[in-house]
Amino acid sequence: LDTTVRKVVIDNLPFLLTDTVGFIRKLPHGLVESFKSTLDEVVEADLLIHVVDISHPDHEEQIAAVGRTLAEIGAADKPTILVFNKVDAYSYIEKEPDDLTPMTRANWTLDMLRDSWMAKISAAPNAPLVPPLFISAATRTGIDTLRSVIYGEVRRIHALRYPYNNFLY
């Protein structure tokens, strides 16, 4: 359950990017201590990039589980970029409304899902500074936008912390 730290430079702005293991529901008891170091990294971070596998059928529950965990460790108010990955693997099977069951309560196209998340985020009382991003790391869809948003957020945080260096970036 190790984290990986790399120096990243976007448009001449250097920062450290820490990749942690994903949040795991019902973590085996023996791994709880190892996972605490990952949570320490999250608490120390200036910006969180929450990457969600949009092709996973329970992605909304996974988002909720991460939200609960962040609240438990006191990191719920950290600036966060919500990134839905694997848009290339998201599948939509057209179904008749009569065929939908409580288990398939939402049978949405990717555009419908995107619109739904945009509405949820904008209506939230502590709405994030940037809307959710929809990308595919495999096909590079949305990667330039992700880079740009990360740069903007890191630059904003850097300018707040070091206003005398603002001219550098």
Task: Outline where the language-model segments fall.
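C-terminal-of-GTPase-core extension/linker across diverse P-loop GTPases
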Residues: P57, E61, A65-Y169
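Short loop/turn elements that form and flank the Walker-type P-loop nucleotide-binding site
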Residues: I10-L13, T18, V43-A45, A75-K78, ...
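Structural beta-strand/beta-sheet cores of well-ordered domains, especially the beta-sheet scaffolds
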Residues: T4-R6, L13, L47-H50, K78-T80, ...
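Generic enzyme active-site microenvironment
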Residues: L17, V51, V83
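Switch II (G3) loop of P-loop NTPases
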Residues: D2-T3, V9-K36, I54-P57
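Inter-motif core of Ras-like GTPase G domains
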Residues: G30-H56, R68-A75, S136
